[in-house]
Amino acid sequence: MQRSPLEKASVVSKLFFSWTRPILRKGYRQRLELSDIYQIPSADSADNLSEKLEREWDRELASKKNPKLINALRRCFFWRFMFYGILLYLGEVTKAVQPLLLGRIIASYDPDNKEERSIAIYLGIGLCLLFIVRTLLLHPAIFGLHHIGMQMRIAMFSLIYKKTLKLSSRVLDKISIGQLVSLLSNNLNKFDEGLALAHFVWIVPLQVALLMGLIWELLQASAFCGLGFLIVLALFQAGLGRMMMKYRDQRAGKINERLVITSEMIENIQSVKAYCWEEAMEKMIENLRQTELKLTRKAAYVRYFNSSAFFFSGFFVVFLSVLPYALIKGIVLRKIFTTISFCIVLRMAVTRQFPWAVQTWYDSLGAINKIQDFLQKQEYKTLEYNLTTTEVVMENVTAFWEEGFGELFEKAKQNNSNRKTSNDDDSLFFSNFSLLGTPVLKDINFKIERGQLLAVAGSTGAGKTSLLMMIMGELEPSEGKIKHSGRISFCSQFSWIMPGTIKENIIFGVSYDEYRYRSVINACQLEEDISKFAEKDNIVLGEGGITLSGGQRARISLARAVYKDADLYLLDSPFGYLDVLTEKEIFESCVCKLMANKTRILVTSKMEHLKKADKILILHEGSSYFYGTFSELQNLRPDFSSKLMGYDSFDQFSAERRNSILTETLRRFSLEGDAPVSWTETKKQSFKQTGEFGEKRKNSILNPINSIRKFSIVQKTPLQMNGIEEDSDEPLERRLSLVPDSEQGEVILPRISVISTGPTLQARRRQSVLNLMTHSVNQGQSIHRKTAASTRKVSLAPQANLTELDIYSRRLSQETGLEISEEINEEDLKECFFDDMESIPAVTTWNTYLRYITVHKSLIFVLIWCLVIFLAEVAASLVVLWFLGNTPPQDKGNSTYSRNNSYAVIITRTSSYYVFYIYVGVADTLLAMGFFRGLPLVHTLITVSKILHHKMLHSVLQAPMSTLNTLKAGGILNRFSKDIAILDDLLPLTIFDFIQLLLIVIGAIAVVAVLQPYIFVATVPVIVAFIMLRAYFLQTSQQLKQLESEGRSPIFTHLVTSLKGLWTLRAFGRQPYFETLFHKALNLHTANWFLYLSTLRWFQMRIEMIFVIFFIAVTFISILTTGEGEGTVGIILTLAMNIMSTLQWAVNSSIDVDSLMRSVSRVFKFIDMPTEEGKPTRSTKPYKNGQLSKVMVIENSHVKKDDIWPSGGQMTVKDLTAKYTEGGNPILENISFSISPGQRVGLLGRTGSGKSTLLSAFLRLLNTEGEIQIDGVSWDSITLQQWRKAFGVIPQKVFIFSGTFRKNLDPYEQWSDQEIWKVADEVGLRSVIEQFPGKLDFVLVDGGCVLSHGHKQLMCLARSVLSKAKILLLDEPSAHLDPVTYQIIRRTLKQAFADCTVILCEHRIEAMLECQQFLVIEENKVRQYDSIQKLLNERSLFQQAISPSDRVKLFPHRNSSKCKTQPQIAALKEETEEEVQDTRL
C-alpha cells in the first residue's frame, strides 16, 4: 500500500478533500489494485482502537456490578461526536435562514418599496454566502461522524473477535455461526453510516421551533395547519411502514424456503446432475418464487405509495398553511414563496430526519446491548497444570457438556430418592435427563508415563473426543483431577485448514526448523503431493483447502500437530480419510517412529493401532470399559468386540440411539394442528409426556445470515415444526441465542441474503459453533460460503431526499454484500474474491441497460407512459406558475391594501377563491397522476426480475461442471440472494426515482428558461459539469466500492475459520497470532472504506460548489435583469434552489442506479454461461394408461423404439481422458477397459489418485475425450439426461434437500406410496421413516439433520433402487457407517442389484473382497485391471493393502490351520460426524 497523502495535506486540502485527487485520477485512467490504496492513519488501526476500547471496557467491568458498554464508548468517542454534531446543527440552521433572505429579495421588487431595490444585490450576496457556509460546515461534519462510526465499528469488531476466541465450548454450543456473523455485520454496520443521523434527535426539535417561529411571523396561527398536516402525514407513513413490514415478514419465509433449496442445490449441483434432477429442482424453486413475488409486489406497492406521499405532500403543506391566512387577510406573493421555502425544510425535518434519527438510536442502542450481552458470556478456562510433570493422570473424572448439569444431576437424584411421585414438570425434567443430563464421561481413571502411546477406542458417542477436550481444558470436569504438563499439541478428527500456504498451515506460527519440517513432511507422506504443485508448499489454500482431497487435508492437519514440539500429543482419529496403505505407512513412520519419545493419546478403532499401543482405554457410553495392555485385553475382555460392536448387541444399542434421536426430534419438533403457517414467528413449545404442548411463545428474531446457513423449516404440509422450550430458570433466548428478542418489529430489506425469522431452535445444535468445529470438511467448508452480508433498515419514512445530507441518508443502506472468501495476505487476496473483478466493468455499460430494458417487451411502453404523464404534469404546473407570476392588477376600490399597480397580490375574496380553486384543482390532478404514474413501471420491473431469475436458474442448472467448478459456491448463491433482492426491492424504485427526478429537473429548467432565457445559458454548462464530474468520480468510486466489499471477505472468513479451528488454536496457544491476522484484515478493509468515504465526500462537496456557483449566477442574473414584478423573481429563485437540490439528488440517484445495475450485469453473466451438450429431455414415456414407465425407453436412432435400454449393463470404456476445465491438465489419461453385465468392479488407488474422478467422468460431469458405450450405445448418440439415467449413484457427499421424505426419494412424483414403501422396506428405511410424524410427508431440514449418516446413505440407495438403473456407481458408500447400516447396504446390493453392474470405490477391504475385478489407478492411468487372484499373486497396490487376516477370509482353504486359531478381533468402527453431534461429541 502507498503512503497516504492525508498525512502531509494542508488544512485547506483536508477541508476540501483535495488530497484524494491522485487516487481519483488513477482510478479514472486505469483499474485500481490493492497496491494503489493508501495506508490508513495510525489512529484508525485496529490495534490502537481495540486497545483503547478494551481498556475502557475492562475499567467498566472492574468498577461496576452492571457494566454498560455505552459508557466505555462514551469515554472513547463522546467529545468528538458532540463537536461534529454542533457543526451539523449550524449547517442546518443556515437552511432555516435562507428563506428569510429570499423573502426580502422578493419584497425588494414590490412596486411600493422601490427604495429597497438597491439592497437586493446585497441580499443576494448574503444568500449565496449562506450556501457557502453551509457547504463548509456540513461536509466536514458528515465526514467526521462517518469517521467516528467507522472507528467504533473497528474497535467493537476486534473486541467481539477477541471475546469469541475466549468463549467456553459450552457457550459456543449454544451460539450459531450465523448469529456471530450477524452480530458483526448487521449490528455494527449501524454505526458506520447511521451515526451521522443520530444528532437529528435534538437538532430537529430545535429546527422545528425556529421554523415555526419564522412562519408564525408570516402567517400567524395558520402556520400550525401545515405542521399538523405534516404530523398526520408522518403517522400515515408510519401506518404504511407497518403494512410494509407485515408483507415483508410474510415474504421472509418464502425467501428463506427458496434460498434453502437454492443453496442446497448449489452445494450439491454435482449430485443434482448425477440424479438428473435439474427439472425437478427448477420447478420446486420456481413455485416458491411465484409465491414470494406476490408478496414482493404488495410490499413494493405500499412502499411506492409511501414514497409518493412525500413527493406530493408539498402542495398540501403550503395549501393548508396559506389558505386560512389568505382567506382572512389576503396574502402577498413574497409570503407565498417564503412559506414554500420554509415548508420544504420543515417537511424534510418532520417526515424524514426525525424518524431516521429515532430509528438510528433505536438500532444503535439495541446493537450495543446485544454486544454487551455477548461480551459478558462465560469464558474458556485453562486447566491448571505443572510444567515439571512427565506423566498424564486422570483420577475419577466425570464431566457434563451441559453447563451446571453436575449440580443438577445430584439434586435430581436426591429429589427422586426422597419422593416416589412428582408433578408433571418434575417428571418431564427427569425423563429428559437421560438425553441431556447424562455425563459424557464418568469415573475415568488412567495414567501414562512419558513416551507412552495410549490408544482410546470405543463405539460412537462413547466420549473419546470429549476425553481429549477435557485434557485440553475445553470441557471442565465436574469432579476428579487431571494432571499433565500443559504443553499440548492437537490434531482434530475433522481436518482444519486455515487460509494460507501449506507451509504456513504446518508451521502454524511456530519458529521454522528446516530439518524438523522436512522430517514431518516425509513422515506424513506429503512430499509426493507437494511436488505436484508448481508452487510446492507455497501454494495458497482457499475455501478451507478445497483444492486438496480429504486425505491430503488430514495429513496436513497431522503434520501441523507433529511439527509442534510438545510434551503431549492428542490425535483424534487422524486417519479417517486415508487409504489403508497410506494409513499404515504414516502410523509407522510418524506415530511410532518420529514421535517415539513423546507421550501420545490416539483415538482409533484399528486393531493394528491397538496392538502397537502401550496402553489401551476402551470407553463405552462414557464409562471406562477397559484400561490396560493389548494382551490384558485379550485375556480379560475376550468379548469386548461383540460387547461393543457385535451386530446383535449393536442392533439393540443402535435402536436405543435411534430412540434417542426420535426423542430429540419430538423435543425439537411439535405438531401444530391445521393452524396456518406463520413465518413471522418461530414458536417454542414443550413436548410433554402427556402429549400436551406448552404455551406458545413468539420469537421474531431477524437473522439474515442464518437464513443462508440453513434457514428455517420448509413447510409444505399442515405440520408446523417448532422448537422446544427447555426447563430452565434462565430465559431461553439468553441461553440459545446471542441475538435477543428485541428485534421484533424490525423492517429489514434483504441485501446479499434475505430476511430470516431467526434461527430455528430445532437446528440450534446443528448450527452451533461447537457443531461447526466438529463438522466434517466436506460439509463444514460450505458454511462460510453461505454467510451473507448486512441487511438494511427501511425506516417508517419513505426513501426520498432534497438535500445532500438527506441524499446521504438515502444511501445509508447502499452496502455491498459481504462475501466471504479465503485469504489474508494482500498479494493473494484478489485470488479469493467471489466476484471476478475483471469480468464486470467499473461502470455499467450501455449494453447492459439496453438488454435490461428489452428483457420484457412492455417495459419500453411503460417508460413512454411515464413520459406522457409527466408532460401533462408540467403543463398543469405551468398554469399555476403563469398565474402566480402574472396576476393582473386589481381594482383599487376592491383592494384590501390600497396600492397602485400592485402585481401578484391576492386582494379580494373572489380573486383568492379563484386562485385557490385553480391551485387545488391542479394539485389534485398532479396528485392523482403522480400516485399512479409509477405503478406500471414498478410492476413491470418486478416482472423483469422474475424473468431474469428464471433464466439464471435455468442457466446454472444446465451449465457444465467445468464452468461451475471455476465458480465459488458463495458467489453463485450471492446471485440468487443479494442480486435478486436488489432486482426485486431496490432497483425498481431507484430507477423510478431517477426517472422522476430527471424529468422534474428538465421541466423546471424549461419553466425558468421561459421566464428568464439568460438563466438557461447558465444552466447548460452546469449540467455539462455535473455529467463530467459524475463520469470522473464514478470510475473510481465503483472500483473502491468493489474493493471495499471484497475487503470485507477476509474479515468474516477469518472469523469462521477461527471458529472451525478454535480447539486447535487454543491447543497451540495461537490466539494472539490470529488476533494479529484479524487486525490485518480489518486494516485492509478500513483502508478501502476510509478512501471510499473520502472520495465520496470530495464528490459531494464538488457538487455543492457547482451548485453555489450556479445559484450565484442565477441570483445576480435575476436581480439585474428582472424589471418590475416580484412574482418572476420569486419563481426564478425558488425554482433555482429546487433545481439544484433536485439535480444534485438526480446525480446521486444515477450513481445508485449504476451501482445497482452491476447486479444486473452479474446476473447476465450467469445467464450467458455455456450449457451442457445435449438438451435435457424427458427420460420416461407413459404407458397407454397414462402412468409413467418404471424403465427408460431410449430415444435413439441406433436402437429400436421398443428396446429397453440399458438392458444388461455391459460397459466399454475406450481411451477416456478427463479434465476438470477445458484446456486444463488431464486428471485421467487413456483409460480403457470393459465390464461385463452384472459384474462387480472395485477401484483401487491412493488418496487423490482419481477414483472419484473416474466415476464423475462416467456421468459426463467433466470435460471428457474418448468414448464409453453401454449395451452398444455410445454416449455421443443420446442426450445427456438419457445417459445419466442409466446409472444409479451413491455419492461420497450425501445430498438430502429440504423437503419431505417422499420428495427426496421421488422428486418427479413418478411412484406411488406403495412402491416407495416397498423400496423403503428393501433398504431398511421403513422403520426409520415410520418413527417421524407424517411419515413420508415429514419435512427434512438442514440436510436431514435428524438422520444419521447411515440413514442418509440408505436414502441414496433407495433412490437408486427406484431409478431401476442397470449400472450402480458407489463412491465410498461405507465411509463412517455403523456395522448395521453397512450390512443393510451390502444385503441390498446383493438382492436389489443382483443383476446390475456395480462399480465400487471403497477403502474397506471387506467390501472390496466381493468384487470380481479390480481397476488399479496410479498417476492418472490404469496400472492393472485383473481379478483378485492375479492381483494377490503379483506385487501390486492391492497386495500391499490387504492384511493376512483378510487373505484368510478370502481363501480359507489355503490356511485351514489358521482357521482354528483364536478368533480375530474385529476392528472397531470409526465415529461419524453426525453421530458425534448427536451425542455431544
Curated annotation (Swiss-Prot):
Residues covalently joined to lipid (S-palmitoyl cysteine): C524, C1396
ABC transporter domain location: 423-646, 1211-1444
GO MF, one example: chloride channel inhibitor activity
Residues in compartment: Extracellular: 99-122, 217-222, 320-339, 880-918, 1012-1013, 1117-1130
Stretches the record annotates as Interaction with GORASP2: 1387-1481
Compartment(s) of residence: Apical cell membrane; Early endosome membrane; Cell membrane; Recycling endosome membrane
TM segment ranges: 78-98, 123-146, 196-216, 223-243, 299-319, 340-358, 859-879, 919-939, 991-1011, 1014-1034, 1096-1116, 1131-1151
Membrane topology: Multi-pass membrane protein
Residue segments, region Disordered R region: 654-831
Residue(s) carrying Phosphoserine: S549, S660, S670, S686, S700, S712, S737, S753, S768, S790, S795, S813, S1445, S1457
PROSITE patterns for the chain: ABC_TM1F (PS50929), ABC_TRANSPORTER_1 (PS00211), ABC_TRANSPORTER_2 (PS50893)
Cross-link Glycyl lysine isopeptide (Lys-Gly) (interchain with G-Cter in ubiquitin) mapped to chain: K688
Keywords: ATP-binding, Cell membrane, Chloride, Chloride channel, Endoplasmic reticulum, Endosome, Glycoprotein, Ion channel, Ion transport, Isomerase, Isopeptide bond, Lipoprotein, Membrane, Nucleotide-binding, Nucleus, Palmitate, Phosphoprotein, Repeat, Transmembrane, Transmembrane helix, Transport, Ubl conjugation
Family affiliation: Belongs to the ABC transporter superfamily. ABCC family. CFTR transporter (TC 3.A.1.202) subfamily.
Name used for this protein in its record: Cystic fibrosis transmembrane conductance regulator
UniProt source species: Macaca nemestrina
